[in-house]
UniProtKB/Swiss-Prot annotation:
This is UPF0174 protein jhp_1494. Belongs to the UPF0174 family. Coiled coil: none annotated. Signal peptide: none annotated. It holds the Pfam family DUF3944. InterPro entries: DUF3944 (IPR025217), Ubiq_cyt_c_chap (IPR021150).
Length: 253
């Protein structure tokens, strides 16, 4: 199976190997740390040639995701890859996420991450929600009820920026811990995650419940769900890096 040009995955070619590590591991390893029985990445020429220098074969990594996507669509010809947006929409269906297939991929990814965050907020008590709003620097919250605080958090997430990226990393990290048994390298930045570490508990519990139901649906989803969440987070990281560069350029003028 060859890589099908996919504009939603082309940005992976711009990333460093350290960024691609999480996606590689999601595609290759299961929760027990053993290689997935049907993974083809580590037997590829690209892997044998470049090893952990993932940036050298980002296209082959994207191809592997398309391959797993084809395994979750019974209607597709075996061996023919599926474009990322179709995989993402299939994942959203499994997670019961509301979305419009005609909208931009980034918006669908945002809806997916928002759904997980929303469900984690539902599991928090009033004090936890208030604490999170304080950490996110949401102002004038003293007179807001729990529902309004949750709405403010979701609105902040959808507005984008560093706080949105921070929340996305925490959501993705909780998914990785639950599904893969380990966190993401993206979450290694303590400055990024330490202030919102309390959120990983509720998110992890929610994902555990969701995963128990989804696991029966087929082994392909054990890959495509965390892979889509990692891709969405990497895209946010790229967008945030671009915004930071623009800000620096403006300041230097």
């Amino acid at each position: 199976m060859a890589y099908k040009y996919d504009r939603d995955l082309e940005f992976l070619k711009q990333l460093e190997s350290s960024d691609l590590l999480d996606l590689f591991e999601v595609l290759v390893f299961g929760k027990d740390g053993e290689k997935r029985h049907n993974e083809k990445l580590t037997s590829s020429i690209e892997y044998k040639r470049h090893g952990d220098d993932y940036a050298k074969y980002a296209e082959r990594i994207a191809e592997e995701l398309q391959y797993y996507g084809s395994n979750s669509f019974a209607s597709f010809i075996k061996g023919e890859g599926v474009l990322y947006k179709e995989i993402l929409c299939d994942v959203c269906d499994k997670l019961k996420v509301n979305y419009n297939k005609k909208t931009e991929t980034t918006l669908i990814e945002q809806n997916m991450l928002s759904k997980i965050l929303e469900r984690s907020l539902e599991e928090m008590d009033d004090e936890e929600v208030k604490e999170m709003c304080d950490e996110l620097s949401i102002k004038n919250t003293d007179n807001l009820n729990r529902q309004a605080l949750s709405a403010a958090t979701l609105t902040l997430f959808k507005m984008g920026g560093f706080k949105s990226y921070q929340l996305a990393v925490i959501v993705a990290n909780a998914v990785a811990k639950t599904i893969l048994g380990r966190g993401l390298s993206l979450a290694g930045n303590q400055v990024l995650t330490r202030t919102l570490s309390f959120l990983t508990g509720p998110v992890g519990w929610i994902i555990t419940g969701v995963w128990t139901a989804i696991d029966i649906a087929g082994p392909a989803y054990r890959v495509t769900i965390p892979a889509c969440i990692v891709v969405a987070t990497l895209r946010l990281k790229t967008q945030q890096a671009n915004e930071d560069k623009k800000s620096l350029q403006i300041e230097s003028v």
